[in-house]
Amino acid sequence: MKVLIVLTSHDQLGDTGRKTGFWLEELAAPYYTFKDAGAEIVLASPKGGQPPLDPKSNEPDFQTALTRRFEADAEANAQLARTVRLDSVSQADFDTVFYPGGHGPLWDLAEDRDSIALIESFIAADKPVALVCHAPGVLRHVKAATGRPLVEGLQVTGFTNTEEEGVGLTQVVPFLVEDELKANGGHYSKGPDWGSYVVRDGLLITGQNPASSTEAADVLIRQLTIH
C-alpha cells in the first residue's frame, strides 16, 4: 500500500500578520495509522521542501500522543523537511491520497491546478480520496467526470461554521468549508463541534475536524482493503 499525503505550502493567515499552515494532529494521526499498517508514505506540497506548521497546532492544549510521537521521530521529521513538489507526483504511483487540513489549504490547495487535477485523477482511477477538517475545502473546484462538482449529491463533512466561529476566523478565511460544500451541492452533515465525525460516500472520505483524523485514516484503510 502506497499513500500520498498532500500538505499546504501557505503560511500567512489572511491579512492578520499571523502564521498558519498545516495542523500537526491532522498529519501525525494519519501518518502513523498508515505507517503502522505497513504502508509506504510519500509527503508532497505545492512548493516542496519543508511545509509550514501552524504554530498553534503544536501548543500544549492541542498536542496528542501522536503529535508527540511525530515530534520525536527523526525519520518522520526528515521526510517532512523534504516533501516532494506536488507537480512531480502521479496518481498512478499511489493507491490513495490523504489531505490534512489546517487553514493553509484554503488559500493554496483549494486553487492549485495540480491538486485539483490530482484528485480528479484519483477518482477517475477508482481510488479513494480522504480529506479532513479544512481540507475538504480543496474540493471546491474539483469536478466529477460529468463536469459537475465532485461533491454534488455526495455525503460530505468538513470544518463547521460554528467551529470556525469558535476559533475566531470566520471573517479571515477566504471561504467557509461548510458553506462551500453545500454551495457545490454536497449533502453536508456534521457531528458535535470538536468531536470525531467521518463520512464516506463511494470513493470520497471526509472528516470534520482534527479529532476526526485517525478515524478518517482508519476508514480509508478499510476502503483500500475491501476495494
What are these regions (language model features)?
Residues 1-125, 137-227:
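Extended, subdomain-level signal for the structured scaffold at the beginning of enzyme domains
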Residues 128:
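Active-site cofactor/cluster-binding pocket
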Residues 133:
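Catalytic, metal-anchored helix/loop core of enzyme active sites in primary metabolism
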